[in-house]
Amino acid sequence: MAESAVLPMDRIAQTNLQLYCQLLDQRWEDRALGLVAGAYELALRLFAVRVRPNRKPFICHLVATASVTAAECDRAEVTAASLLHAAYTLGDWGDGKHGATPQRRAVVERAAGPATERLVTSYTAMAWGYGATAGVLTRAADLDDDERTVVLMRLANEVDEWADGGLRFSDKGDYPRFGAENAAAVRELARSLGYVRVAELLDEAFRRHAALSVPRSLRIEGTDPGGGRVAPQSRLLRMGVRIESERDAGRALRRGARRLAGAVQGRRTGASPGPRQSTTGEHHGD
């Protein structure tokens, strides 16, 4: 039988191993652990090169969100869905599409089960942020079980947004969504739904955020609120080789076009054709 956990801010998991150890300490069963591990493997592929606006690896944010939900709720599909909560909006699927397409939903379902997939879809569909969070708060008493679960995932996401002063390290914290009014709604929503541990973590995260001052040398400006991708050096080198090859091909095409034009002109005027490339590889008239 899984147990709930008291989760200090400094013990929120940031890696898969830390998350697994947390779940083992909470006595999660093997089936539940396997479901979470399957979700992590898919998340690792979808977010391998994505970073947060503050340059925190996105996979660490997903793990932290899952860690918070696991401390509050012992349902494996909720923790698995927390690992994949941004899959349909920010995951790198490589299909050129957007949102929860049937093909993407099928992949998530195969990796983490239908209950997990439904939660990820519901998370994606729930309006959240400036104004919307207050709207959820006004109808908190009328939320059904699934909506309450998705709100828990949203609140866990908020914990990691604010934890470690994360919003101080980029200009994402300047958005209205992270203003005092919305922060108050988030805190009150956690309390009204009885998510005591999440409410405590939010309180601590807000306090740390308020007390932290970050120098300009560590602050990332002009970022997309969803973060971005960082290509590995090996990929950049391969791209450089390909670009150079394409440039060489372009030069060859232009040389060929000039020779053809010269030959056509020579036929018309009776002059000899234009310059040719020698058999030694030297270029003339380029």
Model-derived features: positions:
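Active-site helical microenvironments for divalent-metal-assisted chemistry
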Residues: 2-276
